[in-house]
Amino acid sequence: MRRVVAWQRHGDADKTDMMTLAKGLTGAHLPLRAVVVNEKVSKHFETEMLFTGLTYTGHPLACAAGLAALRAYEDEKLIKRSRLLGGEMFLELEQLKQRHCLIGDVRGGHGLFAVIELVSDATIREPLAPWPQTPPQLAGLVRKALSMGVSFAVRGNLIILAPPLVIEENELRDALVLLDRLLTEMEAT
């Protein structure tokens, strides 16, 4: 929740009618999900009952964890932090794209979440391997990064960056420097 602050990327004037929340609502410690609606939608359900849930509805421990997580988001200003650090991360990834012919596309820029698409030829954006295969050289990059304490998620030709909202600026910078170095090594082979 709030990693990408995607609903805010269209500006404050764009109001959402309905939003679903889940894993991040409790910091992924307990299962809890919610559907948050605006006043217009809420009024509809005052007269038209929606029968859902039962077993896990309103579980007190999960709700308490959700409340604590929401307080932490506000108290620690994690949303603002996600926007700022995510913006810096995305700018650095765009610079990496200029330096590395393996990078075909960088997607994200709305918070601490981004995807790098790796290609064998940037001009035609040919993937390194057919989807959903992970190219061996990319699997090697991930293993090297992990041996140095940095975890990059991979799906096929995609590197997924989703650092924790509480990551320190120097840790994020170090991870991006490492990624730059590992991409350079990958291009040399």
Which residues make up each language-model segment?
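Conserved N-terminal phosphate-binding loop of PLP-dependent enzymes in the Aspartate aminotransferase
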Residues: 1-189
